[in-house]
Amino acid sequence: KRNAVDHVSFDARAGEILCIAGIDGNGQTEFIHALTGLDKSNGGTVTLCGKDISHASIRRRGECMSHIPEDRHKHGLVLDFTLEQNLVLQRYKEPEFEKGGFIKKDAVRAYAERLIEEYDIRSGQGPVTTARSMSGGNQQKAIIAREVDRNKPLIVAVQPTRGLDVGAIENVHKELVKQRDAGKAVLLVSLELDEVMSLSDRILVMYEGEIVGEFDPKQITVQELGLYMAGAKRADKKEGETA
């Protein structure tokens, strides 16, 4: 039986946007689920902040990683929760928001109002708006605000602009670049060639569960990158050495 992901090995560096590019169904989802802890992996090692987190819980991985998931409804938000509840999903146990087993509602409200203003999250009833009633673009803004504000060294962003309008896409792109410029490592998974070429500092192409090429976006054309993504070309890890 073939593994969904096979011998994938790379480093994500501080201060860069590393993009994993590929056509849907070539192992990207399985890889990200193994990295973030949504699914267990059959083997291999994941090292983050100098620690082996290969068998760590999602919560422990979250100590060094923020995750903007591919499916914002399934993995990003609890749709029947309010906006403010969603904004503290990973942080409600922190002393800032909890004391003696009780949530500090005023602190949660103040935090939510700050993020709403800073990230221009638009919702009919402000912090108490049900997430389900918000537009896709504002749902995504909420997820990005929550994950970025956690201030972790690695940001994993999977299809962060899927289903968004042009204005929302531009906002997402600006935020990812801002985080890169602030010294974060940004791991971007995208199917969109234009997005890959415009945002990436380094590109890894995944095809049938393997990395088939590593490229500098300044040294490859959109057309050639498309050939690698479709499996028509293959390179060794070093740029330009075709196999």
Show which residues each predicted segment covers.
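Glycine-rich phosphate-binding loops of nucleotide-dependent enzymes
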Residues: 1-243
